[in-house]
């Protein structure tokens, strides 16, 4: 130890070195005191570019963009009017109409407007009623029927002379059973036949007389052809049975009516709701094939 002390004494820069060490200790002590006064923050590794440029990120206005002018709104909206901009404008409700006819692409469209303020159950009942009327329209002439009010609804009364083998009671409509093939050839009594010839007789068209039901029964399954308005189209072919829905329906409608072939075809087309469509594309001059 004595030798170490001797060496240190003989060191020529001992005083300068000691002074430098003391200065470093004093500077280090000042840094420690200053860091204790500041808030201690955890230092994380600078992995991302945003951490390396924190000094350039400020919350002040961006000088690269022009200032946005403030819009003055002198109109003060009420609470009810504040959200008008977000409301959906619906089309104005149309007044109630029972039936609207439209012709779209040559096809007749009938729009039935449902009664107002119906519940879901009542709406379904209304749809079923309309469907039932469409179904029974093949059996009776609704355009000649009478409508009467009853305590439960409406009563539709057929206004025509029924043929033999056909029941037109209203209560039996939902349980209608298609007739057997033998009923298609039922010959009605002579009291139901019409002896008055039509204005356009079938004989003038080269056809047998069709004034009686017995004659119609032999023609309802014969092919009928009507020519197109445009020659490039094919003729339209059908039978009276197809037109009226069944042999029995055609026989019931035509028996005792005194119709000629053209009138019978026009009536069938109207019942099926395709008369306007057909008369635009075809000439209503029917003839048996």
Swiss-Prot record:
Positions of post-translational Phosphoserine modification: 246
InterPro entries in the record: Phosphoprotein_C_viral, Phosphoprotein_central
Organism superkingdom: Viruses
Keyword Chaperone recorded: yes
Annotated compartments: Virion; Host cytoplasm
SUPFAM superfamilies: Phosphoprotein oligomerization domain-like
Keywords of the record: Chaperone, Host cytoplasm, Phosphoprotein, Viral RNA replication, Virion
GO molecular function: RNA-directed RNA polymerase activity
Compositional bias ranges of the Low complexity kind: 182-204
Chain positions with Phosphotyrosine modification: 11
Signal peptide: none
Annotated site (Involved in oligomerization): 126
Major localization listed first in the record, in broad terms: virion
Residues the record marks as site: Interaction with the Nucleoprotein-RNA: 270
One cellular component (GO) term of this entry: host cell cytoplasm
Stretch list, region Disordered: 170-211
Description of how the protein assembles with itself and partners: Homodimer. Interacts with the L polymerase; the association of P and L forms the polymerase complex and positions P optimally for encapsidation of newly synthesized genomes with the nucleoprotein. Interacts (via N-terminus) with N(0). Interacts (via C-terminus) with N in ribonucleocapsid (via C-terminus); this interaction allows to package the L polymerase in the virion and positions the polymerase on the template, since P acts as a bridge between N and L.
Its job: Nonenzymatic cofactor regulating the function and conformation of the RNA polymerase and part of the transcription and replication complex. Binds the viral ribonucleocapsid and positions the L polymerase on the template. Acts as a chaperone for newly synthesized free N protein, so-called N(0). Plays a role in virion assembly.
Comment field on protein domains: The N-terminus is disordered and is involved in binding N(0). The region of interaction with the L polymerase is necessary for transcription. The hinge region is highly variable. The central domain is involved in oligomerization. The C-terminus is basic and essential for binding the N-RNA template.
Family affiliation: Belongs to the vesiculovirus protein P family.
Name of the protein in its database record: Phosphoprotein
